[in-house]
Each structure stands twice: as structure tokens, then as C-alpha cells.
Amino acid sequence: MQHRITVWGVLAILLSIGLLSSSGQAQAQTARSENNRAIASYNAMQAYFYKNDGSHLYLEQYPANPGDNTYSYEWPFSQAHIATLDLTNLPGNTGKSYLPALADRSLGQEHYWNTTGATGLPGYDSYPRPPYGNGGDKFYDDNAWVGLAKIQQYKMTGDAATLARAKQIFALDVSGWDTDTTHAAPGGIFWTQAPWSHDRNTVSNMPVAELGLRLYQITGDKYYLGWAQKTYDWTNAHLLAPNGLYWDHLDLQGNIEKTQWSYNQGVPVGVNVLFYQVTGDKTYLQRAENIAKAALAFYGQYNRLYTQPAFFNSIFFKNLLLLQSADNDKQYEKAMTAYGNNVWKTYRDPATGLFHTDGSATTTLLEQAAMTQIYAVLAWKSKQYSILY
């Protein structure tokens, strides 16, 4: 039987091809734009923050104030490190060109490493160790971010050393678990080893759950799954608010600090995605989607998203992309793209390439690194979102 194709049929085929071609071209153009923005943001970070003194370290902010430390604290450094890691995953040779820079960041990162601590375990101090500084108290959340970055690098490269360091960090973090049953809401991982704080935070528990789940996926060791469940359950019991979002922290008397930061919503999204992956229980995926929906609605009101620090939003959006890798809902990528577009147009100084998202004349390393991460990840192929936090 012969098939007859009418003129209108031919036109329909040509039109569909044209639409597909236009869509593909638009996606490619968007990726190129994000790629260029990531590179420009990184170049500004290096130009204004990187210390060309052989230390492999950075400034805390630009312009520096007279009383500033010589180098940045560990948390900002780690985000510059992660920004560089994200750049190595840009398509083609562009990503590969950042491998020497990533090696440089790895050297700098180790200047914060301390072989001892309050719980007897090694980890990253909050400030560089001698000869670059005198170290500082360990923060469990700061260490968790590095652990998650090491997992990302392991998934990208298979480097066994990064996996080994992630395991060390996890051991440190769970050593910070509150074991005093006389405390209000006993349990939970403390925020820091510093003597001036005894808070147990969403951000010192949920990222550890995320790290534990990643380690369980890689090793199959139920030790990691057990701790992930323990920290997840404690946070849900004590810091999950009636609006479906998470409060910041709880003190030893049971008083709750009820600020709802964006990164404290993003990480639980990622944790639930990983629980779904390791258990196959769709309840976890539904929880992830519910938190994401509630967060996007909450931060979409009253310009709230732009009152959140960029370095909280980068973590928030990366976890939404991890959710997208599981449910294929592109609204998360669209929301991240819209945020990136607005920050680029509204809060960036085109003369310097620096961001001023808080309206001040100073740019922090945290801020610049966060926006570099956002543009870099948006330039990735969407199938790569599954390696994010």
C-alpha cells in the first residue's frame, strides 16, 4: 500500500523539524551563555580574591578592610574550591582546562586540615593552620560541605583519595552527636566544636545525612545508612516547621531559632532523593517534591529569594537539580536559571565582574564562588545533575 503525503503533511513535518531545531538551538545558546557567565565569574574571583603568594589561598572579601585576616576562613575557601570543581565538569575541553586550578584548590584546602580536635578526630579547622595561620575551631557543617564535594569529585573521577577523605570527614561529623540525655531534645549533631555555641542545627545534621547516604551508595556499608537515618529522624522530629520547611537550630534548653534559610530546605530535598534511591520507597520522593514545592512558593513571595545569601541559594538550587534528576521536573532548572539571570542583570558590576547581592560595596568570596557555581552547573548537561549534593 502506497503512503500519500499531502502538501500540508510535508509542511507539518518541516515545521516540526524547524521547531525542534529552534528548541535545540535555544538550549545550546543558553548553555553557552551560562558557560560564559561561569567563566567570567570565576575570572573575577581569581582576579580579586586569589592570593598570589604561593599559599593557594584567598581573601575573605574585596575590597579588604584594614582589620581583615590575611586569608579567608575555611567555609568561603571550600566554596571557591567547589566552584572550581564544578567548572571542571563544563562540556568538552573547557572543563578539562580547569583541572590544574582544581589541583591548586586541593593544595589550599589542606592548609585547613588539623590531625586532632575536640573529639580526637581530624578535620578541617575554620582558619588555615601554621604557617599560614593559627587554625580555629572546627565546624561540623563546614566539614560536611567538603565531604560532599569530595564525593562529587569521586563520582566524576574515581579518585580513591577523595573517597577516603570523605569517610574521615563523616567520622568527624558523627563524633559531634549530642549524647547527653539531660538536654532538651537530646541527640543531633552540634554545629561546632567551639565552646561558645551548643546549638544543634539543620545544617549540621541534614548535610551529614546526605554525606552518609552518598557513602552508603558507594560502599554498601550500613553504618553510613544508619547514621543518615539517625540524623534525618532527629532533624525531622525537632526542626521541621508546620509549613513544611525547616527552622535553623535548637539550643540545649529547647529554644528554637525559627529562621528558614534556603539551604536548610535544599539539603533535605537532596536527602529525601537519596533515601528514595537507596530504598525505592516513593514516599521519600514525594517528601522531596513537597519540600521543593513549599520552598519555591515561600521564597517566591515578597522577593524572599533575593533576601537569602547567594551562597545559601547555590546549595538550595543544586539539591533541586538533584531532585530533577529523579523526577524529570524541569521547573527546578527553570527557577535556578531565572535566579541566575536576575542576579547577573541586577547585582553584578560589569566593570569588575563582582556580585553585590546584599547591596553593599563589598563582595565576599562566598558570594562570588556561589554565583560561579550556579552558572557552572547550569552549563552542565542535565543528565549530570545526579552527581550533585
Protein language model annotation of sequence segments:
Residues 202-208, 212-216, 223-272:
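Active-site cradle of extracellular carbohydrate-active enzymes
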Residues 9-19:
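Bacterial N-terminal signal peptides
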Residues 99-218, 226:
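Extended ligand-binding groove/face enriched in aromatic
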Residues 26-28:
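Boundary at the C-terminal end of the N-terminal hydrophobic targeting segment
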Residues 1-11:
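Bacterial N-terminal signal peptides that target proteins for export
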Residues 88, 92, 154-158, 216-220, ...:
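Short coil/turn linking the two alpha-helices of tandem helical-hairpin repeats
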Residues 30-83, 87-141, 200, 260, ...:
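CBM-like carbohydrate-recognition segments
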